[in-house]
Structures are given as structure tokens and as C-alpha cells.
A protein has these predicted regions:
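Extended, compositionally biased non-globular segments
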Residues: 151-207
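C-terminal edge-of-domain segments
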Residues: 208-212
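A glycine- and small-residue-enriched flexible loop/hinge signal that marks low-structured segments
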Residues: 1-165, 204-206
């Protein structure tokens, strides 16, 4: 999670998101009141460095389960009473079209309010990956990472063990494939039970070269 200096939200680049950037999320929000706002306006901050809401985002992530979106209104209020952007501009003073562009095209993270709902919340849980990527949101990345770690934990003891080959096809024997898939599925079964997955299926390619 990265928090850059925002010199002007109206001139903030909105063409930085793209493929293969799922490990990056960019926070351009900060508080428009309280200590954060005072620090931003202080004469000691002559360079007008943003006093980012990065800490708030990290706090929400630490509280959220891997599959939960930090923009979930019911669960994750930010505690920021007056949302602003990193140049000190209040979110409420910014044109809605620009906010939409920063959100959907720029894929930035910042704080927003909702009509009829007290408090402020995250606009979304974007990564800087493509919006149509399987890894377009932080929770998608975190969930997949947990699945991979879990599978590795269960499968690692099988390394160096016997694998059997079908004498006719030269491919992995069906019972070897079934065994490895059953072992790997244990991690995903636990995640599904905990509500972190909607479903799962491990597939082991029987045609892979295991003897070379």
C-alpha cells in the first residue's frame, strides 16, 4: 500500500493502473479535520507533503478477514470525520465526475461519505491491477495468497515421495493424482468452512513431466 504526495487532486494521473499490478494499492485520501489536517496546514510543512490516511487503511486491513472488502459500510467505518484528498481538498468540494474518475479509472483509495449514513468509509478496495483482473481487489489477492500458502503447507510433506505412472499413457496414475488433489483440498476445505471461499477445486495435471 503506497501513499504518494498529492500536489493537486484535479491533476492526479488516472492512467497508472494496468495489468500485473495486483500487489500495489495507492491511497490518496487524508483527513480534512483534526490533527492530520493541522499537520498538513502547519507552516513547517512548507512542501505540502500529504498527511496520508495510509494508517487508517492498514488498520482496516489488519481488522478485515482475508475475504472481506474494507469498503464494507457495516463493518469498516474509517473514523475519519471529514474526508479530504492528499492536497487538502475536501472530498465534498470535488466534482462528482472527478471522484468517479479517480475511483473507477484511477483506481485510487480514499475516504467517502454516503447519503443517509453517518461517518466515512473507503471508496473501494482497489489494487492498481486492471479492473477486469481476478486480482482487482485487495481481498481477492489476500484470499488467493492464503489459499496458496495453505496448499503449500499441506503438499510440502509430499515432496520427494513416490509418484506412480500409468504404464500405458506414461502420465501420472489416476490414484496418485487423486491423492495429491485430496491433500491439497484440505487447505481449501478449511477456508470454505470459514466463509473465505464460495467453492474450490484443486486440479493436478497428469501430463506433467515428473520423471525428468
Amino acid at each position: 500500500v503506497y501513499a504518494p504526495k498529492v500536489s493537486s487532486v484535479k491533476q492526479q494521473a488516472v492512467n497508472l493502473a494496468g495489468a500485473n499490478q495486483s500487489r500495489v494499492s495507492v491511497v490518496i485520501g487524508q483527513t480534512g479535520s483534526g490533527t492530520g489536517a493541522e499537520l498538513y496546514k502547519d507552516k513547517g510543512n512548507a512542501a505540502k507533503a500529504s498527511v496520508s490516511g495510509l494508517g487508517v487503511v492498514l488498520g482496516l486491513l489488519s481488522r478485515a478477514k482475508v475475504h472481506q472488502c474494507i469498503a464494507w459500510i457495516k463493518e469498516f467505518p474509517t473514523g475519519v470525520s471529514l474526508p479530504a484528498f492528499g492536497d487538502g481538498t475536501l472530498v465534498r468540494d470535488v466534482d462528482k465526475a472527478l471522484i468517479e474518475t479517480l475511483d473507477t479509472t484511477g483506481r485510487y483509495l480514499f475516504f467517502v461519505t454516503h447519503t443517509g449514513q453517518a461517518g466515512s468509509y473507503m471508496n473501494d478496495s482497489h489494487t492498481m491491477d486492471s479492473g477486469i483482473s481476478d486480482y482487482a481487489t485487495i481481498e481477492s489477492v489476500r484470499t488467493m495468497d492464503k489459499a496458496v500458502r495453505g496448499i503449500r503447507t499441506y503438499v510440502k510433506p509430499e515432496l520427494g515421495g513416490n509418484v506412480y505412472v500409468d504404464p500405458t499413457t506414461g502420465q501420472l496414475a489416476s490414484y496418485t493424482v487423486a491423492h495429491l488433489e485430496t491433500v491439497a483440498n484440505q487447505a481449501l476445505e478449511a477456508m470454505e468452512r470459514d466463509g473465505e471461499l464460495s467453492g474450490y477445486k484443486v486440479e493436478v495435471d497428469p501430463a506433467q513431466h515428473v520423471a525428468s
